[in-house]
Amino acid sequence: MSNIKEVLINKKNCKSVWFMRQAGRYLPEFREIRSQNQDFINLCLNSELSSKITLQPIKRFNLDSAIIFSDILMVPYALNQKVDFLKNLGPKLENFNLNKFLKNNEIDFVEKLKPVYKAIEITRKRLNKEKSLISFVGAPWTLLVYMIGAKSSKKEIDLKLINRKKDEISLVLEKLINYLCLHIDNQIRAGADVVQVFDSWAGLLPQEDLNSFCYTPNSKIVEFCKKKDIPVICFPRGIKENYKVFNNLVKPNGLNIDYN
């Protein structure tokens, strides 16, 4: 059993440290590859390069775990919503169309993400068996924020939009849970042995919406992972004093503590 998996399952007395962006933004070997691959989505779909980037920090620092090089927005991409990464601005998604979203199907979704699973397979074969391979997804709420353009600023959300579209949002969240579980299942089959769920924009939610839009969706994903006997780490960034409530309700194997 790999080190991090043993810590999460057997509750070893060990304080784990997560190196955010293990490769991205600072390793010169990564920056060289990135400079030659301007289209970020295509880079994530290049199985060989994705594996190579994943292993770069392991070769430098001999960390306990590798984190597959990918992005949470590969899911909207696979659901046929155009995703661009603009230099110095970050991700930009085309306007959300509910009817188009609802026409998606699982077969096409998996087909578009096959290069991601291939990258996991390649990496697992190259990675020391004592080291974990962590895959990840964005939580439903966080993906939805990007997909419907719900952010009005870096630290605020368009509450009028959220309140106006609550029925639509609930429908989209439920669909996203299903697609995310499918994505996780395929990552596990490919060789991932730990899953991380990033709820990067959980902190934007008002208190009254945390249960419906954060706790419940995360709980369903955690339950799915546990049925697969795969430990899961959650990161509901920005929920502050609600971390204890999240932990008690969602019951992940591990919890990233917010750094704000």
Question: Model-flagged regions — what are they?
Answer:
Residues K112-N260:
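Active-site loop segments of alpha/beta catalytic cores
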Residues D39, N46, N95-K100, K154-K155:
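Intrinsic-disorder/low-complexity, polar/charged segments
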Residues F30-E32, Q81-L93, Y146-D158:
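Short, flexible, mixed-charge acidic loops at enzyme active sites
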Residues M1-Q81, F85, K220:
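N-terminal basic, low-complexity leaders that serve as flexible interaction/assembly modules and, when applicable
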Residues N88-R126:
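A gly/proline- and charged-residue-enriched helix-loop-helix capping module
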Residues Q36-D39, L98-D108, I162-S170:
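Short glycine/proline- and acidic residue-enriched helix-loop micro-motifs
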Residues V17-Y26, L89-K92, S153, L210-N211, ...:
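Short low-complexity stretches enriched in small and charged residues
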Residues I72-V75, G90-P91, P140-T142:
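A short acidic, glycine/proline-enriched capping/turn motif at secondary-structure boundaries
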